Amino acid sequence: IVSDLMMPVMDGMELSRRIKENLATSHIPFLMLTALRSDVQEKRSFEIGVDEYLCKPFDEEVLRLRIRNILNLRRKYKKMFSSSSNVEELHVKEESRDKTFITNAVNLMKEHYADAEYNLERFVRDMGYSKTLVNKKMQDLTGQPIGQFMKNYRLNVAQRIIQEGSGDINVSEIAYAVGFNDPKYFTKCFKEFFGYLPSSKLGKKG
């Protein structure tokens, strides 16, 4: 969203506040444009969660570059999060609705990843929102739909087990430990995600 600070009916500050306070829209990048050169207004804008604050006059190419950089950074952060399941990789603003949402999602998986019965329906119920909203929010914040997020979290845990293990654990045991009922399916998913077989890093095969 690109908005001017000074607008009729609703100014840019109020619009950005409403956007950032609504869970369905809080992830959307917000760029504030203004002819008012004010350190106070700029600080207030960033406190609300505005992503960029540009003073007029400005070069349109600079605006395009700022937008491109924001989107590129978000794609980079999503990729880093996918391979770590670490909330900090997303660089979400502290004390924001987005940070609360994704932290809750990761904490639920941290608590339940070993439970093979912990499925998408239970996850959505525990998140406390509709399936449509949770799925849209997960894709917007992480680039992953719910099911993929849950599977990737389990695979990341499995990789840590392999990396930190002593080599006396087999593939089947790891699969069951992270909530997979089928070791063959686990191996297939692991290979697709990390590019190597889990057994190649173990002392013995499952």
Model-inferred region functions:
Residues 68-85:
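The C-terminal output helix
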Residues 40, 58-67:
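C-terminal output helix
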Residues 7:
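Receiver (REC) domain active-site loop signature in two-component systems and cognate sites
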Residues 1-2:
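Active-site beta3 strand of CheY-like receiver
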Residues 119, 165-202:
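Sequence-specific DNA-binding recognition helix
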